[in-house]
Protein backbone atom coordinates (compact mmCIF):
# COMPACT_ATOMS: atom_id res chain seq x y z
CA UNK A 1 0.00 0.00 0.00
CA UNK A 2 1.39 3.37 -1.05
CA UNK A 3 4.30 1.97 -3.08
CA UNK A 4 4.86 3.45 -6.52
CA UNK A 5 4.66 0.91 -9.33
CA UNK A 6 5.25 1.91 -12.94
CA UNK A 7 4.46 0.06 -16.13
CA UNK A 8 6.63 0.46 -19.22
CA UNK A 9 4.55 -1.39 -21.78
CA UNK A 10 2.92 -0.94 -25.16
CA UNK A 11 -0.83 -1.47 -25.55
CA UNK A 12 -0.99 -5.00 -24.21
CA UNK A 13 -3.71 -6.53 -22.04
CA UNK A 14 -1.15 -6.66 -19.20
CA UNK A 15 -0.87 -2.85 -19.33
CA UNK A 16 -4.56 -2.53 -18.49
CA UNK A 17 -4.69 -5.41 -16.00
CA UNK A 18 -1.61 -4.27 -14.11
CA UNK A 19 -2.77 -0.64 -13.87
CA UNK A 20 -6.10 -1.67 -12.36
CA UNK A 21 -4.38 -4.25 -10.14
CA UNK A 22 -2.03 -1.57 -8.79
CA UNK A 23 -5.02 0.55 -7.82
CA UNK A 24 -6.69 -2.51 -6.30
CA UNK A 25 -3.77 -3.10 -3.90
CA UNK A 26 -3.80 0.61 -2.97
CA UNK A 27 -0.43 1.27 -4.52
CA UNK A 28 0.26 4.26 -6.78
CA UNK A 29 0.10 3.48 -10.50
CA UNK A 30 2.35 5.17 -13.02
CA UNK A 31 2.68 4.63 -16.74
CA UNK A 32 5.68 5.35 -18.95
CA UNK A 33 5.54 6.20 -22.66
CA UNK A 34 6.40 2.99 -24.48
CA UNK A 35 9.10 4.62 -26.64
CA UNK A 36 11.05 6.30 -23.82
CA UNK A 37 14.83 5.99 -23.83
CA UNK A 38 17.14 5.53 -20.86
CA UNK A 39 17.28 9.22 -19.85
CA UNK A 40 13.50 9.66 -19.73
CA UNK A 41 13.12 6.41 -17.78
CA UNK A 42 15.84 7.40 -15.32
CA UNK A 43 14.26 10.84 -14.78
CA UNK A 44 10.85 9.47 -13.91
CA UNK A 45 11.76 6.24 -12.10
CA UNK A 46 14.46 8.02 -10.10
CA UNK A 47 12.41 11.07 -9.18
CA UNK A 48 9.40 8.96 -8.16
CA UNK A 49 11.47 6.45 -6.18
CA UNK A 50 9.44 3.69 -7.82
CA UNK A 51 9.69 0.35 -6.03
CA UNK A 52 8.56 -1.84 -8.93
CA UNK A 53 8.48 -1.75 -12.74
CA UNK A 54 6.30 -3.90 -15.00
CA UNK A 55 7.74 -4.32 -18.48
CA UNK A 56 8.86 -6.76 -21.20
CA UNK A 57 12.10 -8.68 -21.58
CA UNK A 58 12.95 -6.63 -24.69
CA UNK A 59 13.00 -3.47 -22.53
CA UNK A 60 15.60 -4.87 -20.14
CA UNK A 61 18.48 -3.57 -22.28
CA UNK A 62 17.37 0.00 -21.47
CA UNK A 63 16.59 -0.80 -17.84
CA UNK A 64 19.90 -2.56 -17.21
CA UNK A 65 21.78 0.55 -18.39
CA UNK A 66 20.19 2.66 -15.63
CA UNK A 67 19.34 0.14 -12.90
CA UNK A 68 22.40 0.89 -10.76
CA UNK A 69 21.18 4.52 -10.49
CA UNK A 70 17.75 3.43 -9.23
CA UNK A 71 18.38 2.17 -5.67
CA UNK A 72 14.68 2.23 -4.75
CA UNK A 73 13.71 -0.03 -7.68
CA UNK A 74 13.49 -3.40 -5.92
CA UNK A 75 11.46 -5.50 -8.38
CA UNK A 76 11.00 -5.83 -12.11
CA UNK A 77 8.04 -7.85 -13.32
CA UNK A 78 8.32 -9.16 -16.87
CA UNK A 79 5.11 -9.97 -18.74
CA UNK A 80 6.78 -12.37 -21.18
CA UNK A 81 8.75 -14.85 -19.09
CA UNK A 82 7.19 -18.06 -17.71
CA UNK A 83 9.02 -18.17 -14.35
CA UNK A 84 10.81 -15.89 -11.93
CA UNK A 85 14.41 -15.39 -13.03
CA UNK A 86 15.75 -14.15 -9.68
CA UNK A 87 14.44 -12.67 -6.42
CA UNK A 88 14.09 -9.28 -8.14
CA UNK A 89 13.17 -10.30 -11.73
CA UNK A 90 9.68 -11.75 -11.48
CA UNK A 91 7.26 -13.38 -13.91
CA UNK A 92 3.88 -11.72 -14.38
CA UNK A 93 2.42 -15.10 -15.37
CA UNK A 94 3.69 -16.79 -12.23
CA UNK A 95 2.50 -13.94 -9.99
CA UNK A 96 -1.01 -13.94 -11.46
CA UNK A 97 -1.62 -17.66 -11.98
CA UNK A 98 -3.56 -17.99 -8.72
CA UNK A 99 -5.36 -14.65 -8.92
CA UNK A 100 -9.00 -14.63 -7.95
CA UNK A 101 -11.68 -14.38 -10.63
CA UNK A 102 -13.59 -12.04 -8.32
CA UNK A 103 -13.05 -8.34 -8.78
CA UNK A 104 -13.25 -7.34 -5.13
CA UNK A 105 -11.99 -3.79 -4.72
CA UNK A 106 -11.08 -2.57 -1.24
CA UNK A 107 -12.59 0.66 0.03
CA UNK A 108 -10.35 3.70 -0.37
CA UNK A 109 -10.70 7.24 0.85
CA UNK A 110 -10.99 10.02 -1.75
CA UNK A 111 -7.67 11.54 -0.66
CA UNK A 112 -5.71 8.27 -1.04
CA UNK A 113 -2.99 8.68 -3.71
CA UNK A 114 -3.75 6.63 -6.83
CA UNK A 115 -1.91 7.67 -10.00
CA UNK A 116 1.41 9.41 -10.65
CA UNK A 117 1.72 11.10 -14.03
CA UNK A 118 4.73 13.00 -15.32
CA UNK A 119 4.52 16.04 -17.53
CA UNK A 120 6.19 15.77 -20.93
CA UNK A 121 9.02 18.08 -19.91
CA UNK A 122 8.41 20.52 -22.75
CA UNK A 123 9.11 23.49 -20.44
CA UNK A 124 11.95 21.91 -18.46
CA UNK A 125 12.45 18.82 -16.35
CA UNK A 126 9.34 16.57 -16.27
CA UNK A 127 7.32 17.04 -13.10
CA UNK A 128 5.39 14.39 -11.23
CA UNK A 129 1.69 15.08 -10.71
CA UNK A 130 0.06 12.93 -8.04
CA UNK A 131 -3.64 12.16 -8.52
CA UNK A 132 -5.92 10.94 -5.75
CA UNK A 133 -8.61 8.28 -5.81
CA UNK A 134 -11.25 11.00 -6.09
CA UNK A 135 -9.69 11.90 -9.45
CA UNK A 136 -10.18 8.31 -10.68
CA UNK A 137 -13.91 8.72 -10.06
CA UNK A 138 -13.94 12.08 -11.82
CA UNK A 139 -11.99 10.76 -14.82
CA UNK A 140 -14.41 7.89 -15.19
CA UNK A 141 -17.37 10.23 -14.91
CA UNK A 142 -16.03 12.87 -17.30
CA UNK A 143 -15.08 10.30 -19.90
CA UNK A 144 -18.69 9.13 -19.99
CA UNK A 145 -19.95 12.71 -20.20
CA UNK A 146 -17.41 14.04 -22.72
CA UNK A 147 -17.35 10.98 -24.94
CA UNK A 148 -21.04 10.20 -24.41
CA UNK A 149 -20.22 6.60 -23.49
CA UNK A 150 -22.83 4.13 -22.27
CA UNK A 151 -22.48 0.65 -20.79
CA UNK A 152 -23.16 -0.78 -24.26
CA UNK A 153 -20.23 1.04 -25.91
CA UNK A 154 -16.78 -0.32 -26.60
CA UNK A 155 -14.19 2.45 -26.64
CA UNK A 156 -10.57 2.28 -27.77
CA UNK A 157 -8.34 5.25 -26.99
CA UNK A 158 -5.49 5.56 -29.48
CA UNK A 159 -3.30 7.60 -27.11
CA UNK A 160 -0.34 5.79 -25.53
CA UNK A 161 -1.02 4.98 -21.88
CA UNK A 162 2.26 6.66 -20.98
CA UNK A 163 0.47 10.00 -21.32
CA UNK A 164 -2.40 11.32 -19.23
CA UNK A 165 -4.99 11.04 -22.02
CA UNK A 166 -4.14 7.38 -22.62
CA UNK A 167 -4.50 6.60 -18.94
CA UNK A 168 -7.47 8.82 -18.12
CA UNK A 169 -9.59 7.84 -21.12
CA UNK A 170 -7.93 4.65 -22.31
CA UNK A 171 -7.77 2.79 -19.00
CA UNK A 172 -9.79 4.58 -16.33
CA UNK A 173 -12.56 5.94 -18.58
Where are these regions (language model features)?
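Structural core segment of the AMP-binding/adenylate-forming
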Residues: 1, 24-94
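Conserved AMP-binding A3 loop
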Residues: 114-138
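Conserved structural elements of the adenylate-forming
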Residues: 97, 129-150, 158-159, 168
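Conserved AMP-binding loop of ANL adenylate-forming enzymes
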Residues: 3-7, 147-173
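Conserved AMP-binding/adenylate-forming
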Residues: 1-36, 160
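Short hydrophobic alpha-helices that are characteristic scaffold elements of the AMP-binding
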Residues: 20-25, 47, 163, 172
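Conserved S/T- and glycine-rich ATP-binding loop of Class I adenylate-forming
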Residues: 5, 22, 53, 113, ...
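Conserved pre-ATP/AMP-binding loop-to-beta segment of ANL
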Residues: 78, 96-118, 125, 148-154
